Structures are given as C-alpha cells and as structure tokens.
A protein has these predicted regions:
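Gly-rich Lys/Arg/Thr-decorated short loops/hinges at beta-loop-alpha junctions or inter-strand turns
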Residues: 1-3
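Active-site-proximal beta-alpha core segment in soluble small-molecule metabolic enzymes
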Residues: 5-8, 15-16, 27-105
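Conserved PLP-enzyme active-site core in the AAT-like
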Residues: 24
Length: 105
C-alpha cells in the first residue's frame, strides 16, 4: 500500500508564473488571482502572500476567507465572490470595506 500522497508547492514557480502573466497582459491590466477555498487546498496564506505584490485584488469566496487574509497581513485587498447582504458597522470587514481593503461583487 502506498503512503498518503504529498503535494509540494514550488513558491518560486508561482513567482515565475505571475511574472509571466504580467508580461503577457502588460502593466495596465489589473490581476485578481482566486485564492478561495484555502487556495484550492494549497494554503491560502502563503499562496496569497506570493501573489499579492503582483495583484490588484485577491478573490475569496466568503467574508471568513477575507478575514483570514486580513489577520495575516496579506497586502492585496480582497474581492468577495459570495453575495454579501450586509456587514455590521463594528465588523472588521466593514472597516476594511471603507478603507479599500475589501471589495464586493
């Protein structure tokens, strides 16, 4: 029987890929990589940190996914893919929305 499978993420390849995309689309195009669902199981925090410097926004599905990125000081603002009906004024996400750190679809 084989042991549990392992996925190794090559962060240098992520850097190279985002640079290649940037070269193809040019500096005027705004990039918004999707890091929802824990970056599809690859680890949203570390993937988001690598993508953030070259991205205008990082797309997440839910408010909780955005909170995770905010708590870990990921520099790019988040774009919610999930419809959001309301945010409480005292909520961290409400403050981030006012400050441009969160965007709604």
């Amino acid at each position: 029987m084989r042991p549990t499978s392992v996925i190794r993420i090559d962060l240098a390849s992520i850097d190279a890929n985002i640079r290649a995309v940037r070269r193809l689309v040019g500096p005027a195009c705004r990039l918004c990589p999707i890091v929802k669902a824990d970056a599809y199981g690859l680890g949203a925090r570390r993937i988001a940190r690598r993508l953030a410097p070259a991205s205008h926004l990082l797309a997440v599905y839910s408010p909780m996914q955005a909170v995770e990125l905010l708590e870990h000081r990921v520099s790019a603002p988040s774009l919610f893919l999930m419809p959001v009906d309301s945010l409480a004024r005292g909520d961290e996400l409400y403050r981030a929305l006012l400050g441009g750190g969160v965007h709604l679809t």
